């Protein structure tokens, strides 16, 4: 392990001894091999100190080269992997964590072209944290910003499905779970503020246009979300047409019919909307493609519910 002594020359290039130069700036105890290095600790260091430490590990860091090369990467971990290929890095053990986390911190500080995968992963988690605090609006704001980054990457790399994007995204997250949570959160907010239905429509339309080869359950989920948003905005004809199109593609998708009818039940308590919902449920019952008895029973229950209220 590379150990920096107090009397060694400071890696910042000043020519001074480490104890007389940057020792007080470095809040991390690099000399303790048992001490873990955390991202929050590195964020507290100034840029000069971070770069000095990278140079100490024999990484010939150059501002202009770093900024120019960022466009070739999406992950700070992948960037640091290439440093290991290019330089004879002396970091060992827990010190190796410093390398990729330093790349992440410098990425955030020195460029605003795009967020790295690690930052996007953290923002997605931050959105979930906001949801746990019942701050749905902040969660949506964070997540829609992340989606914009993903859109740029999808267009640049030519991905056609969410599965393709997930394979290249450096994270343990399942993007399919996050995508459906984002869509549902926009819908829930739309029930309180109709502007969010417009955001839901835009998100759903972007997803379907950019990632049309995603798995069927995602196409179904996002398509019904778009159609439902139109109905709640009062554009019922457009919403109905979109439900009809998705059900033409998936004729035995019972829950597509149920979700369609439910939107009219949720709109208001008017007799006309109840009749509309009943017509949709009965349309599904008349559909010869729906054969499962459990699905048929659910539809019959829905018909009884609207008839009795």
Q: Where in this protein do the model-derived segments appear?
A:
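Canonical positions in the second alpha-helix
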Residues: 146, 207, 246, 283-284
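Flexible helix-coil transition and linker loops at the boundaries of alpha-helical arrays
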Residues: 109-114, 149-175, 189-194, 205-219, ...
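Helix-turn-helix repeat elements of alpha-solenoid scaffolds
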Residues: 92-104, 138-162, 192-205, 232-239, ...
